[in-house]
Regions:
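Non-catalytic cap/lid and distal C-terminal segments of serine-dependent acyl enzymes
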Residues: 1-260
């Protein structure tokens, strides 16, 4: 695998942004094995959780080893504390992720596919929210999404525990969040009314994770709306031991049915 650390300017955010990228490389040296597809690389946008950045997946998991021997490219960007959202008070991160980031990746790495069925998103916690939001908000561009302990039912969470000032800066009040495109279950309902080719979703949560009730409520509503949901609960808390194991299991699911 080849690793790239990118720093570039975002016109939407009006600042420099960082992203790490892993690309397949044909090699058998030093214990690595690698291959490249005949066509373009399928691509996984791998999103971090709150308080982390574009480096965290390579620091806390063996993601590079998990994708070696596959044609999968991995793009790891950062949203800082922006929750992959056009913030109520702050920066327009959703516009960056949905409009500018894919175009930048195509510009820098033209070997990345732009085919929906080979474009994926995954993330942990806040990143799980972002991954599912990309799939629901851009169903013509993303074929699959993986949420690991994702904050998928924010409205339910805020009914259980009042929103912090940080969350209010991101989403506004609970009333402003409810029914908006930042409310994933409302977005899911909107998308299933306007699209027939819906993204496939994989939702995983540890049985000792405080977000488990909200993973269950999100799963139930998504299935009710007609989404293809692969759901898994297994022992684990809200930590990297759980996410490392689950992203490893998710890679074959993402590539399922793909000739390699």
């Amino acid at each position: 695998m080849a690793h790239f650390a990118i720093n570039c300017f975002s016109d939407i955010l009006q600042m420099s942004v960082n992203l790490n990228v892993i690309l397949p490389q044909r090699t058998t040296r030093h214990g690595f094995t690698g291959s490249t597809p005949d066509g373009k690389f399928p691509v996984l946008y791998l999103l971090h959780g709150m308080g982390d950045d574009q480096t965290i997946w390579q620091r806390r998991t063996a993601i590079e080893r998990y994708v070696e021997g596959t044609p999968l490219a991995v793009v790891m960007p950062t949203t800082h504390l922006g929750f992959y959202t056009d913030m109520h008070h702050g920066l327009p991160y959703w516009s960056f992720f949905s409009q500018e980031l894919p175009a930048l990746c195509q510009q820098f790495f033209p070997q990345l596919t732009d085919r929906r069925e080979y474009t994926f998103a995954a993330g942990n916690s806040m990143g799980g929210y972002g991954a599912v939001k990309l799939a629901l908000g851009m169903p013509d561009q993303f074929g699959k999404a993986v949420s690991l302990s994702g904050a998928l039912d924010l409205v339910g969470m805020e009914k259980h525990t009042p929103a912090t000032p940080l969350m209010q800066n991101i989403f506004g009040s609970t009333e402003q969040l409810t029914g908006s495109d930042n409310d994933l279950l409302a977005l899911a309902e909107k998308t299933c009314k306007t699209h027939t080719n819906l993204p496939k979703l994989r939702i995983c949560c540890g049985t000792e994770d405080p977000l488990l009730p909200f993973s269950r409520s999100a799963k139930a509503r998504l299935i009710q709306l007609g989404y293809d949901v692969t759901y898994q609960e297994s022992p684990g808390v809200h930590d990297w031991a759980y996410w490392d194991a689950q992203i490893r299991q998710a890679i074959p699911w993402l590539l399922e049915g793909m000739e390699m």
